[in-house]
């Protein structure tokens, strides 16, 4: 409530706390998402979530475009299919018009740089463990783990921002992601390693969702079943996948990046799914 906090910024806040004898102002440092520049900050609340004390701040924002999916499909807005990748590629995006024509493709890279930076920090942690034994697991390495945390946050914000800006530049109204089974996602992430490009996919998606919402772009999930099995160019079955080059080839001989193929199919399925619903609604009406 007003009077119980003051000087709230992205990184600090002062809270009025009861010590048991008197009220005092306590200076606190904050870690987490940046507050939106155009947002109106509401009264924060302190919530304890073991082992952290969290400051939750409601934000009131004006959304540029509050229309729903049906309205955007009816208005023939562009759709962007996004598939997360591995190695150097964080994500691949394919932009389609309402009639299914591809107008733009982009690979969002930087995964190798992210992995290398994380690995250098992990090497420091391992050396500290070897030098300090049990003590190396405590405060000695706290600053290194904070570096890992900051790297995760930095790259997740950077890639999510790049995707949203790319979609804005291509007048995208809907961003579609393939939705996989939770067990499958865990298996793939475990196989890719702790500090791979795919390791950040969940956080990138989280940051991207609210950034897109602020820009008037909807983010939705599309059932991923079978998206990787067919060629996005001709619809033929995929018959081979080269995991070294990440290329896939269909029965008709079309060869393309397998993540791009899935991104294209995701955008296509999104269009087909909601255009079908639109036609059914018009027929019923």
Predicted region positions:
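Acidic carboxylate diad motif detector
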Residues: 1-52
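Positively charged, helix-rich recognition surfaces that bind polyanionic ligands
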Residues: 53-285
């Amino acid at each position: 409530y007003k009077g119980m906090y003051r000087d709230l910024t992205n990184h600090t806040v002062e809270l009025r706390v009861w010590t048991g004898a008197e009220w005092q102002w306590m200076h606190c440092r904050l870690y987490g998402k940046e507050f939106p520049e155009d947002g109106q900050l509401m009264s924060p609340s302190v919530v304890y979530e073991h082992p952290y004390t969290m400051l939750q701040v409601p934000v009131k924002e004006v959304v540029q475009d509050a229309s729903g999916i049906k309205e955007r499909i009816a208005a023939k807005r562009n759709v962007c299919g996004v598939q997360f990748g591995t190695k150097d590629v964080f994500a691949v995006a394919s932009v389609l018009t309402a009639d299914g024509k591809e107008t733009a493709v982009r690979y969002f890279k930087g995964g190798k740089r992210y992995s290398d930076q994380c690995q250098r920090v992990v090497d420091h942690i391992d050396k500290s463990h070897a030098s300090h034994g049990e003590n190396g697991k405590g405060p000695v390495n706290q600053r290194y783990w904070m570096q890992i945390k900051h790297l995760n946050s930095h790259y997740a914000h950077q890639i999510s921002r790049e995707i949203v800006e790319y979609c804005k530049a291509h007048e995208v109204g809907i961003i579609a992601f393939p939705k996989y089974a939770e067990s499958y996602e865990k298996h793939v992430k475990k196989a890719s390693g702790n500090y791979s490009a795919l390791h950040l996919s969940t956080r990138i998606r989280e940051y991207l969702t609210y950034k897109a919402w602020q820009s008037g772009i909807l983010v939705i999930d599309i059932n991923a079943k079978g998206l990787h099995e067919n060629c996005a160019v001709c619809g033929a079955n995929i018959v081979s996948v080269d995991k070294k080059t990440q290329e896939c080839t269909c029965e008709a001989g079309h060869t393309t990046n397998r993540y791009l193929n899935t991104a294209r199919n995701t955008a296509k399925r999104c269009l087909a799914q909601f255009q079908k619903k639109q036609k059914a609604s018009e027929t019923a009406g």
